[in-house]
Amino acid sequence: PWILLLTTLMVALGTDGLVKSHPRWVDLRPIDSVVYAFLPALAVLGAGLFIDHAIESYARQGMAMAAAVTVGLAAFGEYQTVDPGGRLYGPFRIFMAVATYLVAFSFFTVIYSRDFDVPFAAAFVAGVSALLAMELLREDRIVGRSSLLVGIAIGLTLGEFRAALYFYPLDGLLAGALLLIAFYLATGIVHHILDRDLDLATAAEYVVVTAGAAAAVVAAKAIT
């Protein structure tokens, strides 16, 4: 485990240095650069835990290589998204949004599957959700204290949901999917609120997508 933690720390420090080397970087507060390191660092930790938990045999090497490429692209993406007017800003924001949800799923699955106490599992989910939400909220130019507060609010919501799942036994992958759906709903709604473009049609779209995905998970539970 210490090798995984050391690698996570090295990736976080490397991403921080990479971001600060950008010509457009302006260092205002320590948290401004720390947020950029969340996704690459958590990608390392989440991939390591998920591969150890869910992947077997020679598939582990392939998954590890794919995870390494993803982490490298995420770190490069953090550099490219320092400047919102940059040519590669849009494509990398999309890539990192997808990567964020994949990392969230890996953590949610592992945390649910492991035999952790409910308070610890809920706190773990809350912490991971808060950090990843702060990464997603960078698209709205929400940084500093505002980013932290909104991230904590989303994290607490997901932590409470993880605690509630204690009363509804699920397979780890299905529970991870449900938590991911909740994370998608929470971050999506907050994103539109911050952009001030949340209307009835958008809210209905999120409700339909969330309900459909949740129904699919429940159906999968019934089948298995």
Predicted regions and their residues:
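Final/C-terminal transmembrane alpha-helix of multipass membrane proteins
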Residues: 202-223
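Membrane-helix boundary elements
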Residues: 39-51, 100-115, 124-143, 161-169
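Hydrophobic alpha-helical membrane segments
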Residues: 40-41, 154-158, 175-189
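Hydrophobic alpha-helical segments and helix pairs
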Residues: 37-101
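Structural signature of hydrophobic alpha-helical transmembrane segments
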Residues: 1-14, 56-71, 113-127, 169-182
